[in-house]
Amino acid sequence: MVFKTIWIERYRKLINLFRALASCHGSNLDVEKPVVFKEDAASFGQTVVQFGGSRLVVGAPLEAVAVNQTGQLYDCAPATGVCQPILLHIPLEAVNMSLGLSLVADTNNSQLLACGPTAQRACAKNMYAKGSCLLLGSSLQFIQAIPATMPECPGQEMDIAFLIDGSGSIDQSDFTQMKDFVKALMGQLASTSTSFSLMQYSNILKTHFTFTEFKSSLSPQSLVDAIVQLQGLTYTASGIQKVVKELFHSKNGARKSAKKILIVITDGQKFRDPLEYRHVIPEAEKAGIIRYAIGVGDAFREPTALQELNTIGSAPSQDHVFKVGNFVALRSIQRQIQEKIFAIEGTESRSSSSFQHEMSQEGFSSALSMDGPVLGAVGSFSWSGGAFLYPSNMRSTFINMSQENEDMRDAYLGYSTALAFWKGVHSLILGAPRHQHTGKVVIFTQESRHWRPKSEVRGTQIGSYFGASLCSVDMDRDGSTDLVLIGVPHYYEHTRGGQVSVCPMPGVRSRWHCGTTLHGEQGHPWGRFGAALTVLGDVNGDSLADVAIGAPGEEENRGAVYIFHGASRQDIAPSPSQRVTGSQLFLRLQYFGQSLSGGQDLTQDGLVDLAVGAQGHVLLLRSLPLLKVGISIRFAPSEVAKTVYQCWGRTPTVLEAGEATVCLTVRKGSPDLLGDVQSSVRYDLALDPGRLISRAIFDETKNCTLTRRKTLGLGDHCETMKLLLPDCVEDAVTPIILRLNLSLAGDSAPSRNLRPVLAVGSQDHVTASFPFEKNCKQELLCEGNLGVSFNFSGLQVLEVGSSPELTVTVTVWNEGEDSYGTLIKFYYPAELSYRRVTRAQQPHPYPLRLACEAEPTGQESLRSSSCSINHPIFREGAKATFMITFDVSYKAFLGDRLLLRASASSENNKPETSKTAFQLELPVKYTVYTVISRQEDSTKHFNFSSSHGERQKEAEHRYRVNNLSPLTLAISVNFWVPILLNGVAVWDVTLRSPAQGVSCVSQREPPQHSDLLTQIQGRSVLDCAIADCLHLRCDIPSLGTLDELDFILKGNLSFGWISQTLQKKVLLLSEAEITFNTSVYSQLPGQEAFLRAQVSTMLEEYVVYEPVFLMVFSSVGGLLLLALITVALYKLGFFKRQYKEMLDLPSADPDPAGQADSNHETPPHLTS
């Protein structure tokens, strides 16, 4: 229990905190102390209406007041919080009317209309719901019922044909009894909508009167009296066929829309009839004829006779077949037949019409127009719906789309009702939420005393109930309707349910369309937002009407109410200004927001109130008083003096900048009866808000912020505070900003408990500027004198490709007065891009502040960058040096010279001079990376012999040229090849070059040295130093990136010249070199060696010997060597046999057993 008490207390504190925060943010309804009305009556709060400026009328339509009487109205007094039931004279015929299901008051509070659309009336066995309303006066006294009386029971059109048996089996007296029965039944069923006809049958079929003759007869009873019995056989089936084909025909007065009823009276089975029932009865069924069969006498005790009687009557037989013992007993079944026939009234058949107004439920919605009460009749014409207008003469006018409009079937037109006055024309607006399952709203106007549809707008989502609620709004209170709110409470989205469409009134010839759509809070898919709508009045002081919208299904049916402010004459603000929930007021409140009524001052405080219905409760929420606050700030002096903020070069001290005076003017934002209103005001002051470091501070707080809390009444309230400068000011161009943010927490007014809030248009923040005095001879105009120059930081040539950056050293100076917004702009080719800026390592009397950025120029070939210098002020006599660096693309093409321009400007608007513009050019080269290399498949070695007369062989030297640079360039490839040595041919060479675009020329060049033997000693190399050479030059005008070209030096290499060198081995050397325009290109640094290449071929001479002499000499030598070896071996005893002697010698090794084997035998092949 203690825990529960603590939890409730915390909950209350949390609610109060939320209420205080809501008040600070401009809520317009008081939720702290609402006026609460509570009754135990069933459905109390289902409807509510403000009436007479001092009372609430609340409906409880399900309250059982008495037998056959439901619905009660309550008169609730806001001053006491007490409700009293209103005693009314309810018409006796208004059975169970659900009084109060709709409530509406007229605009001048002189009349109130309370309706009960379920008022019932019994007609035979049918219950019709016609509806009924009560018109009440200004004192809630009964004036009249509308309609004045309940309408008579509807008369169903019926064509009733009698087929009576006139055969000879019936006595004359019984035949007379049968005629009396027919006359009595005609009397009971007679009405303006019922017609009769009669045919007698035996074996003769005779029509006594048709429907036409019956209608034209002045005495219908005499038509029956004149009938004479035919006598004869019984042709019952033939009689039925004749009735179907002839009597129920339009030529005899039968009506297509009428129900067709046939009453057959017979005393027995058919006899000798040529027709069978199986041929006749289907024809009657097809014609939609309801058949009643009456059997008279004992004949029908037989099963076959009874079966025939059941065949004549319609199914089921228990409802359509009657048996009596004699003709006198016919009277006993008159009432039964009458009830059976009356029971079919109001039902539909294939040939009958639908309901008209029997189930109209008049008063489902209602309005009080200039012409009289308007009652929505949703059930008229099979729930197509419409509305009844009851003028003073009480001759009602039914307003609908069309009685035969199938498109309106089950549309529920009249489910909601609203009035509009637009362009001098009174209009009626009706909602049809079930039209085509999506709903629509129709505007009706009166033309030539007929109400006709003028404009309509349709819903989009099936089942959304578009048009379930309507509210016409006069936004500017000029008496003319500006827009209509259309509730769509069952519109479904994943996170919220219901919406309201804001639809401005249509033009004369334009279509009606809706603009803004209002939604409730996310998280309530079954919220039914838009179930109730009302005009609240102007609660925020902007002279535009505000509206309240109920969402009774939010928060698990606890409910909520939203307040939306008017945005313009034709629109509502899309976001709510306040949301009041049922749980915020009472923990157990249910369906809060199911009904709404606003626009009147019921609490007599001069402010409009909002009545909100809930289940068993009605709450009156008062609007809060409005205050408008004006704010002004002024400074003294009007500028910060130069002597205060210019302190460079001296020790900084805190100096007084001036004073700021803040004035608040508090006045009422709307008229009320609350007298003087106190308000708790808090305002926060901030100096230089948004700056990292503020240039000024408050003397009181020694920082840049100051907060004040005061309780103020109506009038002017001022305060002055001192401002200080804590440091030297760099930015003396932009004024010091003082911003004030104000919040209002109004104190409760005496005896009213209402806290004022800020009205729309009140100042809750203001910004003021405190400028600096300018350092100028002429006030407001400074004469700066800027100059700019730069150099390329010692760079002589820009080599594109090897120099990725270009650094420019810039000097800027000001020889005049302070320069404001000093800007240096650089213009350079588009191939360069701004990289960074760096301060020079030089002392400055003022801190140097640089900020550079690239800027568009609008030209593809030109780029620009700008640098602000000491923004905002470049002081008098100041000088700044800095380096700006640009990225140079390795693919850049800048021509042969780079042009860089710079200009200095400021906000002083001084014209450009020769010092403010500077330009400089820098030579440009392009770094390339070209390679020439030898190929491995060149001829590397030749062996030759002079004695055999070898004079020449074919040799190849192969070279490959590659362009590894990103540029396409023009180059030349040079080859040097030895071709003569002292007049002797060396190499008859030709050059095979790539075919496309390569042209080659050649020339002969003499040797560099003439002393052949001296130069070749130790080198053994034949090159252009000692031989005549062929110089080949191939020009390549365009060598693309990554292109490669192959060159082949090929020809017959002679050997006759080698003898001049006195060498056995000589290295033949060719050379190649790449050349290009060095004023445009330069080889990549460190890669110069790849511009040259050599290919060598080793030439080696060998001696050839005679083979015969060699063979003879080798043979003789071999034989002599063999003889010498043989003699030597002989002398050494190699050819003597010593084995036998070895056997004869005693064994050197004794027998291991100590004695020789006596039985040992010498092998036979070793004996002598």
Curated annotation (Swiss-Prot):
Binding site for Ca(2+) 3: D601, D605, D609
Motif (GFFKR motif): 1133-1137
The VWFA domain, residue ranges: 159-341
Major subcellular site: membrane
Key word Cell cycle present: no
Residues exposed to the Extracellular side: 27-1107
Assembly and interaction partners: Heterodimer of an alpha and a beta subunit. Alpha-D associates with beta-2.
The protein, known as: Integrin alpha-D
The organism's taxonomic lineage, starting at the top: Eukaryota, Metazoa, Chordata, Craniata, Vertebrata
